[in-house]
Amino acid sequence: LATSNSVPKASNINAQVRTDGIVSVDVLDHVAYSDGTTVKLKNNLQYDKETFKGLAFVSGDTVRYQASSETGNFPITYTVEDNLGNVASANITITVHKSDAASKAAPTPHDAEAQVAAGQKVRIPITLTGIDTDGDDDQLLGLGNKAPTLGRISEVGSDYLVYEAYPDSSGTDTFSYAVEDWTGQRTKAQIRVGVFQGSSDSGVYARDDEITLRPNTAATVPVAQNDISGDNTNLTVDKHVEVQGLDGVSVKDNMISFTTPGSATTDYIAYTVKDKAGLSDTATLTVNVDPNAAIEPPTAYDYRVPSAATIDKKSVDVDVSQWIANPSGTANELKVGVHPSASAHAHVKGGEHSTTITVDRTARARAVPYTVTNTKYNITSTEFIQVPAYGVFPPTLRPKAPELKVNSRETIEININDYVRVGAGKEPYIERADSVSATKASNSDVDVNDETRKYTAAKDYAGPASITFTAVDGKQGSDKTKIINSAVITLQITVIGRDVPPPTFSSSTIDVEAGADPKTVALTAPTNA
């Protein structure tokens, strides 16, 4: 919040969370500061170590808190500083209430929007933080009670959905997604995807980076993290870089490594990122060398273990290497650990430089705080690994299931046991006939019983299609205490047309400098056949 005042003003904040829950407070939303200045949350939270219960730490511009099993009010003092050196402090009072499944309010997920060209995919991020007054531990289940009609969901991640638009679609596709809290309450929100005909932009956009380091500092910079691929594919950093003022610059694993000179200066590295087609863009990494440069804490991010990765496992191994970085040095200076509060159920697997953490699963979902320490300067950052509960998981897609292909106008019969995985000793069923919907089918009346269904492809279509239904892992019968788990499942189908449609192309812009070396582009990569 920018004002005309010369000194930042921090406000007191109140937050609440259940016992053993997590809450995140965006501090800068409660700070007023002058126009033209920037404000940063300092990494020095203050609280009474004798009476304080729980775990509190700074993560970027937020204060995060994990409650213990004790209720009460726990104040924390936070401090912000602007770029002129002015500081201000205020209190966050966190009220921890007892976990109570009977009275807990349901989560309130947010609606989401996206747009995509026909025939293309788009990743839709789903916000799971701040949607529940009881804490930030809700789980994304996937689709809700309404499936898309202009495309299909091709992937369900721990905090995102991937939507694939059909090649002949246009308009607005409206469907729902579902989340579940720790008590089992499920709520839904809406997703709107604008699908347009015409070429999508498959270009590559490299963004400039800037870093400030002390003299004689070895550093590794993941320059591609903020670069963009128009078709959402991974980018690679070209081995050839142009360097001004630095020696020993190298590229490995899409990161640029170098050592700063021994005195204050500003140097530059021009680098190129490419997609799988060979489309590329160039950006500049500016390296400021300052003897008084601040030592930044390691960067780290949360990781939510997908339910599908935990099936029949009493423990899970999580490699956090792709979620951590060292903005003030090299990755070799980082050490991964587990916060003492979680040591009874988690530990680092392997040697001293291991980045893999083993988490034991328990009867309830667990958030394990892991630490990343810059061993050269002894600065530590903390984030969470969220692990589903042991023994109970909803039906999920069976890995490596056979592909579903059908000729247009023809019919295939699908046994859901071949495509849906459930717990040991259980069988998958379709919950209700009215939960089944199909796209690119000859009619909307899908022939179905609770174990098999038929799909008849439309006569004048070729391309991706789908069938969606609610799967359960048992039948209630007369045992009303039996726990039945359910999930909305989408099976991807490929319809083979009688006539092969012409391929479509994603538009691309290729910049070639006069007199420079030629560029090679693989035309098959931006082509959809």
Q: What do these predicted regions represent?
A:
Residues L1, T62-G72, Y160-S170, M255-Y268, ...:
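Extracellular/luminal low-complexity segments enriched in Ser/Thr/Pro
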Residues L1-G36, T77-G135, S176-A178, W182-G230, ...:
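Extracellular interdomain linkers/hinges and stalk-like, low-complexity segments
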Residues R18, V58, S69-T71, A117, ...:
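Surface-exposed coil/turn segments at beta-strand junctions on protein surfaces, enriched
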Residues D20, K53, S59, T71, ...:
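Feature targets compositionally biased, intrinsically disordered low-complexity regions
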Residues T37, K49-T51, A67, T133-D136, ...:
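N-terminal start-of-chain detector that recognizes signal peptides
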Residues T37-N43, D136-G142, D231-D238, G329-G337, ...:
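Solvent-exposed loop segments of extracellular immunoglobulin-like
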Residues L45-G60, G144-D159, K239-N254, V338-H353, ...:
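Low-complexity "stalk/linker" and mucin-like segments enriched in Ser/Thr/Pro/Ala/Gly
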